[in-house]
Amino acid sequence: MNRQNLAALVAAIAAIVGVGLGAYGLYRSTTTQRDLTTAMATMDASSAQNQVVADRLGIATLQPAQATDVANVALDPADVPPPITRTEPTTVQVTLTAKEVVAELADGTTYAFWTFDGTVPGPMVRVMEGDTVEFTLINDLSSVNGHNIDFHAVNGPGGGAEVTNVAPGETATFTWKALHAGAFVYHCAFPPPMHHIAQGMYGAIVVEPVGGLPPVDREFYIMQGDWYTAGRLGNQGHQTFSNEKALAELPEYYTFNGHVNALTKLYPLQAEVGETVRVFFGVGGPNKGSNFHIIGEVFDRVYS
């Protein structure tokens, strides 16, 4: 077992709810770190490690897949707001609705997503530098949880989260000015924010510079997420959120746009030879980063 895998295993065990810090502290009080390291190093490598992680994290037997509330939670990457053609700032009204829906995470595997507007990622918001944004967040009456929104493009406490806390059936509105051009993430920051993000509550906001971006032939909008499910990767049935795996940063799934097959089977990225393509890419997380690239192509320009 290499040091990296050992560290990941120790971190996973230390974070378990049910074993907890108290139990972990008790274990440390009777067994030295050297003893623990020696014992782990003598294990039969992969099988022993996998079994310990599985036992400690409580990998579950799945219930049957549930009926879905929406045909597809994955957002079509071609669903991008049109480029801004005006040259003067204006007031822009934006409304998003927090919706909790059951949909497929993979073929034959359902999951209870928390979303903005019923998709993962949430819709891309597109404004211009200098615009005044009147933003409204609606929490659908069918929701079970409270939600809010944190725009990383907002200069202010929590990116708006402090003034957009909404219980099911409630609405909140706040106004802010887009001061800096760039591509930014937005996400739910309702406590605990990690849980809300891990359920799919993230998206992107693009603040175009005055005068707009250079024209292109096609645009795509893609966000990566990591999913912490009680069952193993590939198990069919209804997956539920595992707080233990999230704390240990051990995701079972990584997706682009909320579904295992979002950019292949569901919405393959298509362009013609010679076209100029712009990709808006972000990482929802909550824990893992990305080195996004396209096999067979080299980006002409990367900017944020």
What are the residue ranges of the model-derived segments?
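Copper-binding active sites and cupredoxin-like electron-transfer domains
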Residues: 2-304
